[in-house]
């Protein structure tokens, strides 16, 4: 078994009827009649972990996938082999949840993501690198977030700052603004508003 077996970009893994497109032809949105839109061949789909093949796992939402991997029942030998990989998978899924993306399916096409969702995915990937001394510039990252998810995102941003990074955010959400160390207020009526949180608020 090789990684390319699970890639719809490789002739070893892709469905031979649709060449990994998942549709009848390049101009169609009708799912491939052979793979049903899964884009992979029967060999790739026959391999299962925890009773699920790669397509079934990637068709889960991020929170469901984290639950699946956290509750995966494997043998002692399999655990020795997969321990590092499973830890990496669960950490990355948790980062995505921490930035409010629990509802997104793993197989969602990047072109269907909103600007805010794409921005938070990039942020989650940066959080996972444990990079220090970086400058992040974010444009309204809380747009479209539920208040609970907003708090998770603010905590994630605070953690990034605490390990030695600088974050500049363009934001209108009051809670996010109040969580910052320094505020610069632009726009009509802003006057000389700018400075530490206490002096501005």
What are these regions (language model features)?
Residues 1-201:
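Conserved phosphate-binding elements of NTP-dependent enzyme cores
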């Amino acid at each position: 078994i090789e990684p390319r077996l699970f890639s719809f970009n490789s002739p070893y893994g892709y469905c031979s009827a649709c060449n990994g497109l998942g549709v009848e032809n390049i101009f169609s949105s009708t799912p491939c009649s052979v793979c049903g839109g899964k884009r992979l061949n029967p060999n790739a789909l026959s391999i299962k972990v925890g009773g699920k093949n790669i397509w079934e796992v990637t068709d889960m939402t991020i929170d469901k996938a984290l639950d699946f991997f956290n509750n995966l029942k494997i043998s002692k030998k399999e655990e020795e082999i997969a321990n590092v990989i499973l830890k990496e998978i669960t950490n990355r899924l948790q980062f995505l949840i921490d930035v409010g993306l629990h509802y997104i399916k793993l197989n969602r096409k990047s072109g269907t993501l909103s600007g805010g969702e794409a921005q938070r995915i990039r942020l989650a990937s940066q959080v996972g690198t444990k990079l220090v001394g970086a400058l992040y510039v974010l444009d309204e990252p809380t747009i479209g977030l539920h208040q609970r998810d907003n708090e998770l995102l603010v905590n994630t941003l605070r953690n990034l700052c605490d390990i030695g990074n600088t974050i500049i955010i363009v934001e209108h959400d009051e809670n996010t603004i109040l969580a910052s160390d320094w505020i610069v207020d632009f726009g009509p009526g802003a006057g000389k508003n700018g400075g530490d949180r206490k002096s501005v608020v």
